[in-house]
């Protein structure tokens, strides 16, 4: 994805002081280095941070409120054309948040989307992240 110059953002409603250590630990476990070198923007719940720093640009509400994804797209990733955005989610709240933001959703099986009856809000459902490469 990075080789194709596609921007990647991470949006989590988890509070920055809890979410960031978990994200960093996952990257270390997978020998992936610093998440800031992978993601072009990371938005979390919590206090305002500087652009390029871990955390939030100032998220005001958690999912399913659309702010987290609109903030990620327009402020974090500097998107100018919303038709170039696609969201990937495994949670019902995330699907609603993306749809409220006006972005299409690819649902990742394994979360609670199907159990919540929200499959119909996803433009596509996949079992593994690798399947996303065929979509983009």
Where are these regions (language model features)?
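Conserved beta-strand/loop elements of the cytosolic catalytic core of P-type E1-E2 ATPases, chiefly
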Residues: 11-12
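Asp-based, Mg2+/Mn2+-dependent phosphohydrolase catalytic module
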Residues: 15-136
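Catalytic-core regions built around general acid/base machinery
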Residues: 1-5
């Amino acid at each position: 994805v990075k080789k194709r110059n596609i921007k990647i953002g991470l949006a989590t409603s988890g509070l920055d002081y809890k979410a960031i250590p978990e994200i960093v630990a996952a990257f270390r476990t997978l020998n992936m280095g610093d998440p800031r070198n992978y993601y072009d923007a990371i938005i979390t719940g919590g206090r305002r941070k500087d652009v390029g720093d871990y955390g939030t640009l100032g998220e005001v509400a958690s999912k399913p409120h659309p702010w987290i994804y609109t903030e990620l797209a327009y402020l974090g990733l500097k998107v100018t054309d919303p038709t170039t955005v696609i969201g990937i989610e495994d949670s019902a709240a995330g699907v609603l948040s993306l749809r409220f933001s006006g972005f299409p959703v690819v649902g990742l099986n394994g979360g609670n989307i199907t159990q919540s009856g929200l499959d119909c809000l996803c433009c596509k459902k996949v079992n593994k992240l690798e399947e996303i490469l065929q979509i983009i």
